[in-house]
Amino acid sequence: MSRRNTAKKRFASPDPLYKSRLVSMLTVRILKSGKKTLSQRIIYQALDIVKERTESDPLNILEKAIRNITPLVEVKARRVGGSTYQVPIEVRAYRGTNLALRWITKFSRDRSGKSMSMKLANEIMDAANETGNSIRKREDTHRMAEANKAFAHYRY
């Protein structure tokens, strides 16, 4: 047991334009080499593209996309008697949101195209429409958990 005090959970402050914590969390995920203003510009351009194409509130589209991507269960490796089992565990809300944001940024970076803002906008719209690579990743995660349901009694 650690004798130190436990660290308090710090939550991201809302971004200046949309006043949304979700946008500021996405800003941190896209961040490279501490260039936060560039990261914000990429996100705002992506949300403008989403607004042009869908003619609706881009923040609602982003929230819908995150909701669609957020996994409900995931597998965690657990070593029992010399063999490693993939144990399915439920995902807490904050971790689920973090995973969704991580997957959105990863798969938008992997997309082919010119600008990051265009790739991010396409990934957000695909996720809102329940298509795209990030949705496939969520389904793969759920499939892994379903396949290893037999080891659920090894839960932490």
Curated annotation (Swiss-Prot):
Q: Name one GO molecular function term.
A: rRNA binding
Annotated CDD domains: uS7_Chloroplast
Question: Which UniProt keywords are listed?
Answer: Chloroplast, Plastid, Ribonucleoprotein, Ribosomal protein, RNA-binding, rRNA-binding
Keyword RNA-binding in record: yes
Some GO term, biological process aspect, for this entry: which one? translation
- Check the record and name the Gene3D superfamilies matching this protein: Ribosomal protein S7 domain
Highest rank taxon of the organism:
Eukaryota
An example Pfam family from this entry, by short name, is: Ribosomal_S7
GO CC terms of this entry: chloroplast; small ribosomal subunit
The Swiss-Prot or TrEMBL record describes its family as follows: Belongs to the universal ribosomal protein uS7 family.
Question: What does the subunit section of this Swiss-Prot or TrEMBL entry state?
Answer: Part of the 30S ribosomal subunit.
Write out the function statement from the record: One of the primary rRNA binding proteins, it binds directly to 16S rRNA where it nucleates assembly of the head domain of the 30S subunit.
Protein name, UniProt field: Small ribosomal subunit protein uS7c
The record lists the organism as: Pyropia yezoensis
**Corresponding gene?**
rps7
